[in-house]
Amino acid sequence: MMEPFRTHKGTVAVLMNDNIDTDQIIPKQYLKRIERTGFGKFLFDEWRYEEDRKENPHFPLNDPERKGASILITGENFGCGSSREHAPWALADYGFRVIIAGGFADIFYMNCMKNGMLPIVMDKETREKLAAIEARTIVEVDLENEVIMTTQHQFHFSIEKMWREKLLKGLDEIEITMQYEEYIQEYEEKVVH
């Protein structure tokens, strides 16, 4: 069972690039592992680190004021490119629980949900307002009421009912299927006889 997602409070990191693909999120050389953990240190690897593996001081996630952020605000078409579940694993392992973008690649969006992260689609103006808040400001994301709250603003969002319920209850596909166990058994009995 996944951890239910009702509300999340955290700080914001901003990476407003458009078309960030899964290879930029987690480069292919790190995909040999099958565990879901340990990928956070490779998140945005080619941007976060210089050739000598020192942190790139100009990369937003390396800003000391943004370290430990759990909400990522980004551009359009986030998670495009090849389908790899390692990308949401890397984001989650780094500590992100919420990704706010102008849009997501479909498979990436579903993989976020399947891994207990909340991907939120918001327009550019709203994302820019969120991106402009002072570092270390706590932002609250309330999935139940579909609202993002700062000390000065409230921003409403919407999410498909099925995904919302799944996250609120912390259900994975097997647990959802098991809710229909009696119907499945009933069907199997009809088919067998």
Swiss-Prot record:
Q: Do you know which InterPro entries this protein is assigned to?
A: 3-IsopropMal_deHydase_ssu, Aconitase/3IPM_dehydase_swvl, AconitaseA/IPMdHydase_ssu_swvl, IPMI_Swivel, LeuD
Among CDD domains, the record links this protein to:
IPMI_Swivel
**Keywords in alphabetical order:** Amino-acid biosynthesis, Branched-chain amino acid biosynthesis, Leucine biosynthesis, Lyase
Q: Which Gene3D superfamilies match?
A: Aconitase, domain 4
Binding partners and assembly: Heterodimer of LeuC and LeuD.
Q: What does this protein do?
A: Catalyzes the isomerization between 2-isopropylmalate and 3-isopropylmalate, via the formation of 2-isopropylmaleate.
Assigned protein family = Belongs to the LeuD family. LeuD type 1 subfamily.
Query: What is the protein name stated in its UniProt record?
Result: 3-isopropylmalate dehydratase small subunit
What gene does this protein come from?
Answer: leuD
